[in-house]
Design a protein with these regions (language model features):
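Glycine-rich segments within core transmembrane alpha-helices of 12-TM secondary carriers
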Residues: 150-172, 374-384
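Juxtamembrane intracellular "pre-TM" segments in multi-pass secondary transporters
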Residues: 3-21, 209-249
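Helix-loop boundary and gating motifs at the non-cytosolic
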Residues: 11-68, 244-283
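Hydrophobic core of transmembrane alpha-helices in multi-pass small-molecule transporters
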Residues: 102, 113-129, 334-348
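Structural signature of the two symmetry-related core transmembrane helices
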Residues: 90-105, 309-324
């Protein structure tokens, strides 16, 4: 079902972003601040909380695995219910609120295990909100402009997240001398700053979002909940019968595993190699700055060569990146090379996967289908991070 009062007017693919598209994009700027902090600062802080014989790569890998598993189990069920008119924004708000509150809670004086538990909850909040946010793409723009809008989301998310991140890093390194604060206190303050940024850049979406495509009205919510499991089985059957869709899902499962594992484990892996925290931070900033134009460029190239062609090109590039990381990543120089290579392709492959999927699914069942999208994506994340964590635990060597 489609709400005719909220359908977007036809906009040429080459036209500038509309107000509705910009307000959708800006949430990527907000949540990406937490993503970047999770990649650079939080693993280093968590390592400082662990006992001397603790293994941060293993612990971090298991934390990522647990968070991914919870999301993979929850999202298809909640996604089916969220297709009811008006429910998508409520579920989004619930997960977003969980992420922000637990991001603030990480500033509490916790030992390493409770800290990881709170971090897992924050990650669940983030990833849960992103599932509903991704499905909002179909409400924010048209099929013809999805590649462009999705790419701008990732691109501006990469560059926008560097603003609070640079401020937090300056506070962590300069705060002890400027304010007579400890490094630990400055790090905890960075969690609060990130949460505030996240909230500030979510407000435009919360105040303007209108669900264009939906499956049922409010008075049908009870029956929608009761029939969720049978509907999920039916949806899975439809996916299996839709050859382009299930072929994409299988391919997505395998290639996104590499993408998610490299992103989530890069800092802890670099720290285990002995790369100091300053170099890790600068390398990740370089990744963000490289990813900004490359993600937007990928959206433009998709308009010229086609989305599938550009996804294939990014997959081939990522295969080379993973091969490089597995066999050549032994020092700071190789880590810098990895940072630049990842920045060139990660935004494009994520953005175009999101938009391509949005174009081939039924719009009035978008949340349900994006729930299955998350099953494949998060299960892939579970496999990658679990393998890294287990291998490190068994061998005692991250490399």
């Amino acid at each position: 079902m489609t709400d005719p009062t909220n359908v977007h007017e036809p906009v040429p693919q080459s036209a500038r972003l509309t107000a509705r598209e910009k307000k959708w994009i800006i949430y990527d700027v907000g949540n990406s601040a937490f993503v970047l902090l999770s990649t650079a600062v939080i693993p280093i802080y968590a390592k400082s909380l662990m006992p001397a014989d603790g293994n941060i790569v293993s612990a971090w890998g298991y934390a990522q695995t647990i968070a991914s598993l919870v999301i993979a189990l929850l999202m298809p069920l909640l996604g089916s219910i969220a297709d009811v008119q008006g429910m998508k924004i409520k579920f989004f708000l619930g997960f977003f609120g969980t992420g922000v509150v637990t991001c603030c809670a990480m500033a509490l004086p916790l030992t390493w295990l409770p800290f990881l538990v709170v971090y897992i909850l924050a990650t669940i909040g983030l990833n849960g909100s992103l599932t509903f946010y991704d499905s909002m793409l179909i409400d924010a723009t048209s099929n013809e402009r999805m590649d462009k809008v999705s790419s701008h989301g990732y691109g501006w998310g990469y560059i926008g997240s560097t603003v609070p991140f640079i401020f937090c890093i300056a506070l962590i390194f300069g705060g002890p001398s400027l304010f007579d604060w400890s490094t630990v206190a400055c790090t905890r303050a960075s969690f609060i700053i990130t949460a505030i940024w996240w909230v500030a850049f979510t407000i435009p979406l919360l105040t303007s979002y209108r669900q264009v495509h939906y499956r049922a009205t409010r008075d049908q919510l009870g029956s929608a909940v009761r029939g969720t499991f049978s509907e999920l089985a039916g949806t899975f059957g439809k996916i299996v019968k839709n050859k382009p869709l299930w072929m994409f899902m299988i391919a997505f499962f395998f290639y996104i595993d590499a993408v998610n594992t490299v992103i989530s484990m890069s800092t802890s892996y670099g720290a285990e190699l002995g790369i100091d925290s300053t170099q890790l931070v600068v390398a990740l900033l370089v990744t963000q700055f490289v990813a900004f134009p490359c993600a937007i460029l990928y959206g433009r190239l998709a308009g010229r060569f086609g989305c599938k062609v550009m996804i294939t090109a990014a997959v081939v590039a990522y295969m080379c990146i993973v091969f490089f990381a597995a066999f050549f990543l032994k020092s700071a120089v190789e880590f810098w090379i990895l940072a630049i290579l990842v920045g060139m392709f990660q935004g494009g492959i994520q953005a175009l996967s999101r938009s391509y999927y949005g174009k081939i699914i039924p719009k009035d069942h978008a949340n349900e289908y994006y729930g299955f999208y998350d099953i494949f994506g998060k299960t892939a994340s579970i496999i990658g991070t679990f393998l890294v964590a287990t291998t490190t635990s068994l061998t005692g060597n991250a490399s």
